[in-house]
Amino acid sequence: MDSRLQEIRERQKLRRQLLAQQLGAESADSIGALLNSKDEQREIAETRETCRASYDTSAPNAKRKYQDEGETDEDKMEEYKDELEMQQEEENLPYEEEIYKDSSTFLKGTQSLNPHNDYCQHFVDTGHRPQNFIRDVGLADRFEEYPKLRELIRLKDELIAKSNTPPMYLQADIEAFDIRELTPKFDVILLEPPLEEYYRETGITANEKCWTWDDIMKLEIDEIAAPRSFIFLWCGSGEGLDLGRVCLRKWGYRRCEDICWIKTNKNNPGKTKTLDPKAVFQRTKEHCLMGIKGTVKRSTDGDFIHANVDIDLIITEEPEIGNIEKPVEIFHIIEHFCLGRRRLHLFGRDSTIRPGWLTVGPTLTNSNYNAETYASYFSAPNSYLTGCTEEIERLRPKSPPPKSKSDRGGGAPRGGGRGGTSAGRGRERNRSNFRGERGGFRGGRGGAHRGGFPPR
């Protein structure tokens, strides 16, 4: 850790020296004096020249004033000369750079009655990240102001708890284990690989094997995925955003969503992470790519997915250094969204074992997985689905129904006059209800006469 910090300091010192050479500064410490703009330097020079000119002309004018008024007291003249000398000495003092100790000078809207919140500057002053001030981020209070959604979440949690299979887990080295032995094919697969990126950010040594994206791509996920299924892949916040998409395409998935985990530091403001050598800024978020396989439409496949129940953001406190566990909320998002009961968690740990999931990972301390027993939970027709109640179906968000031709109005072929089937432009002027030159019957919106009302 100390060697890493020393290396960062040496690199910073070298950058400052190179910058000083480019700017023509005498040393790295004098860079600040050269960063003033040309306009500022010109303004400072003009101000100094104006002050010197005023000092040079003020002494003769003062002497003439005393002579005109008959005041020739030498003491007063000496006092005035001393005052001028003091002012000139202050002017000749070297320029001192002003040091700002708080953000009051830079706050936005300070002249208004309602100053703006500058969360970026507040982070610089206090170390509190801007995401610390997002309200109602917890599962318990997120839907307090939305009673229908709160009731929907409660009903879905009860249904999921009733339909969950007993928790099963298998201790296995995923790199050497043939995952094709896992049966049956799964509706949901969650991958949480121990990436090298996680340990670069923490600056500690990994206590397990770090997986590269080449190793992850070799996994035969497509062999254990159902024809209609979803995958959730934690990919960090760096190169994994692109390489994770490559993995999804190789396994036959299409990326359809990006769930973002935003980390707060309310409990430990100002804590700085070890800077990733491959990053410019300190990253405070991670991404979980979501992929879809097969044809699933939210408007027609309500038996398999319930869309728009949760949001695609997870906002929780950042874990301690060295802890690479992901928030448990990802399980709630998956269970609320997909109604499939065959759920697989790869690279799981003892802390992630939960009902309704088959957990596989090298760090598990025990195993209870039995292929025949697990397959028996889904032997009945449609038993791989959790099902849905009438109340859940009524409360859940739905896509608007498609509009038919009759809903749009009309249904009869175009033609005739503007209002209906009478196509003449003045041929039947003697008929009742005739509309003159435009033709047709006056109607509403539908039917043969553009409104469906029979002619009177």
UniProtKB/Swiss-Prot annotation:
Alphabetized Pfam families for the sequence: MT-A70
Modified residues (Phosphoserine): S399
GO molecular function terms noted in the UniProt entry: mRNA binding; mRNA m(6)A methyltransferase activity
Annotated stretches, region: Interaction with METTL3: 135-136, 237-238, 255-258, 278-287, 308-312
Site label Interaction with METTL3, positions: Y146, D242, R245, R298, S399
Record region (Positively charged region required for RNA-binding): 245-254, 297-298
Subcellular localization(s) per the UniProt record: Nucleus
This protein's GO CC annotations: nucleus; RNA N6-methyladenosine methyltransferase complex
Compositional bias per record (Gly residues), positions renumbered to this chain: 409-423, 441-450
Biased composition (Basic and acidic residues): 425-440
Record GO biological process: forebrain radial glial cell differentiation; gliogenesis; mRNA destabilization; mRNA modification; mRNA processing; mRNA splicing, via spliceosome; RNA methylation; spermatogenesis
Alphabetized UniProt keyword annotations: Differentiation, Nucleus, Phosphoprotein, RNA-binding, Spermatogenesis
Region (Disordered): 45-76, 393-456
Domain of life of the organism encoding this protein: Eukaryota
Known function: The METTL3-METTL14 heterodimer forms a N6-methyltransferase complex that methylates adenosine residues at the N(6) position of some mRNAs and regulates the circadian clock, differentiation of embryonic stem cells and cortical neurogenesis. In the heterodimer formed with METTL3, METTL14 constitutes the RNA-binding scaffold that recognizes the substrate rather than the catalytic core. N6-methyladenosine (m6A), which takes place at the 5'-[AG]GAC-3' consensus sites of some mRNAs, plays a role in mRNA stability and processing.
Quaternary data: Heterodimer; heterodimerizes with METTL3 to form an antiparallel heterodimer that constitutes an active methyltransferase. Component of the WMM complex, a N6-methyltransferase complex composed of a catalytic subcomplex, named MAC, and of an associated subcomplex, named MACOM. The MAC subcomplex is composed of METTL3 and METTL14. The MACOM subcomplex is composed of WTAP, ZC3H13, CBLL1/HAKAI, VIRMA, and, in some cases of RBM15 (RBM15 or RBM15B).
Membership in a protein family: Belongs to the MT-A70-like family.
Full protein name: N(6)-adenosine-methyltransferase non-catalytic subunit METTL14
UniProt source species: Bos taurus (Bovine)
Gene name of this polypeptide: METTL14
